[in-house]
């Protein structure tokens, strides 16, 4: 028996095969959130979190550290705001 005849003998009828929608693909569903952006440098994160001014990262936090350290630090806000920091300075400030 040749290979082709053997293959045809064991093929299942089309009605036995599972029916998937034509658009079905093994990719992740569209409801998945977009991947997170890369984290900003730590100097920006700490400065933004302490100052509370987001991307502006005021030097006020360096001049009055006790006042700003008492403020609640929200990690979700820090992650969102620190993404605006493009340049970090040795003082911990960013712009």
Curated annotation (Swiss-Prot):
Keyword field contains Membrane: no
Protein name: Late cornified envelope protein 7A
Keywords, alphabetical: Keratinization
Homology family: Belongs to the LCE family.
Organism field: Homo sapiens
One biological process term in Gene Ontology: keratinization
Taxonomic superkingdom: Eukaryota
Pfam families linked to this entry: LCE
Residues making up the signal peptide according to the UniProt record: none
UniProt gene name: LCE7A
Classification of source organism: Eukaryota, Metazoa, Chordata, Craniata, Vertebrata
Keyword Membrane: no
Function recorded in the entry: Precursors of the cornified envelope of the stratum corneum.
């Amino acid at each position: 028996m040749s290979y082709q005849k053997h293959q045809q003998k064991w093929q299942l009828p089309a009605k036995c095969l599972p029916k998937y929608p034509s658009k079905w693909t093994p990719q992740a569903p569209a409801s998945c959130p977009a991947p997170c952006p890369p984290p900003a440098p730590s100097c920006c994160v700490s400065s933004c979190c302490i100052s509370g001014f987001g991307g502006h990262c005021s030097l006020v936090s360096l001049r009055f550290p006790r006042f700003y350290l008492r403020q609640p630090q929200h990690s979700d806000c820090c992650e969102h705001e620190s993404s605006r920091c493009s340049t970090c300075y040795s003082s911990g400030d960013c712009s």
